[in-house]
Amino acid sequence: MGGRRGPNRTSYYRNPLCEPGSSGASGGGHSSSASVSSVRSRSRTTSGTGLSSPPLAAQTVVPLQHCKIPELPVQASILFELQLFFCQLIALFVHYINIYKTVWWYPPSHPPSHTSLNFHLIDFNLLMVTAIVLGRRFIGSIVKEASQRGKVSLFRSILLFLTRFTVLTATGWSLCRSLIHLFRTYSFLNLLFLCYPFGMYIPFLQLNYDLRKTNLFTHMASMGPREAVSGLARSRDYFLTLRETWKQHTRQLYGPEAMPTHACCLSPSLIRNEVEFLKMDFNWRMKEVLVSSMLSAYYVAFVPVWFVKNTHYYDKRWSCELFLLVSISTSVILMQHLLPASYCDLLHKAAAHLGCWQKVDPALCSNVLQHPWTEECMWPQGVLVKHSKNVYKAVGHYNVAIPSDVSHFRFHFFFSNPLRILNILLLLEGAVIVYQLYSLMSSEKWHQTISLALILFSNYYAFFKLLRDRLVLGKAYSYSASPQRDLDHRFS
């Protein structure tokens, strides 16, 4: 009923989607069918500002129609690790050609060598250690597959046990034998240069336990002689941290349960919790990509050069170029495996549920209705809210993100477009391939020609898989774009 407006008239409103503490779950598999009317309140118009906040009673939260992408074939973990190990061995082989090449085509009257490489200068113990380090992921995947539990036949269980025993015994014996020889041959500085990247491996990948919160390093650094007994317990806690970190590392790499799932729910708190978990999972995968790629490039390009004699000449520029090529190529291959098309689609769904807020100038919206932001509400598009003495405008269809949280803004920015990650990887891999083709055409040295031609094959395969995923996802989202636009028009 039309009452008289007055300065003391109070404007009441209800939550846009749900009352505080309530939660809902969609039952439609790939759609969130929650068309809910929002807050009823009066809005004051502006004159000349260009900003408006329509009455929430006239707005609705548009239901999200998630695109169902086709199931793309996923490469088995052990096959992927074999492919990656093979590519790294090729890069190591071509680098040894660069270092120990000879002029074997000279006539016998003045030959420095009768072979294409100076094999007598190669330290095969160092080569064995490098190969084991590069193949650590492949060895771990074999042991993981051979350690599977379940109801298997007696013959299969014996075969799995023998496989695991053979792989671990051969790897351990070869590694110990080579390390003993290296300790007897080289100085402590050389051995430190060989092993120090592993000193940063576990702390960099540490995820489940925050060492700064538990103060393990602080306690161990400040431990006095009277604290030997308590220091033993703290060291046990530290080794427990390393063990749990390694367990998370192997589960993330080789376990079939490593891929998270999307809970298509309507509870703002559950959506934010899901986003926090996905952020942690994505950061873990990026850490794994960064550490593995840099470790591979380090042992392929730098370790063989460090142990070369001072009187031996090699092309330093090509070694640095090979380091960049190996690090970028390994990063793209790992990201293509750890961030498949289904994972990109999962992040996109979570970003669509999270929404985003755009900070606006309070002077431009002083005469526009501004609602106090509450964490248990799902805000529709175009609403202005107040949070932390700032004014924000809702951008997404669903908006449950914290307006002042920069991590929520970054998550929505990167993953609101499901093709952004694949586009970046395609551009990066395409640039590497173009550069390698240009270097191959302009190369005048036989060892560089062989090196570029061999490395190109691994990049071709990675580019093909990325292009396939990009085309499939692009087609799937283009088909679902028109029904979503019709649905937006119907509810607007």
UniProtKB/Swiss-Prot annotation:
List UniProt keywords, sorted A-Z. Endoplasmic reticulum, Glycoprotein, Membrane, Transmembrane, Transmembrane helix
Membrane spanning residue stretches: 77-97, 115-135, 153-175, 185-205, 288-308, 322-342, 421-441, 447-467
Which InterPro entries does UniProt cross-reference here? Uncharacterised_TMEM39
**Is Transferase found in the keyword set?**
no
Task: List the record's Gene Ontology CC terms alphabetically.
Answer: endoplasmic reticulum membrane
> How is the protein disposed in the membrane?
Multi-pass membrane protein
- Where does the record say this protein resides? Endoplasmic reticulum membrane
Q: Where is this region: Disordered?
A: 1-53
Q: Name one Pfam family in it.
A: Tmp39
Q: What is this protein called?
A: Transmembrane protein 39B
What species is given as this protein's source? Mus musculus
Q: What broad taxonomic lineage does this protein's source fall under?
A: Eukaryota, Metazoa, Chordata, Craniata, Vertebrata
In the UniProt record, the gene name given for this protein reads Tmem39b
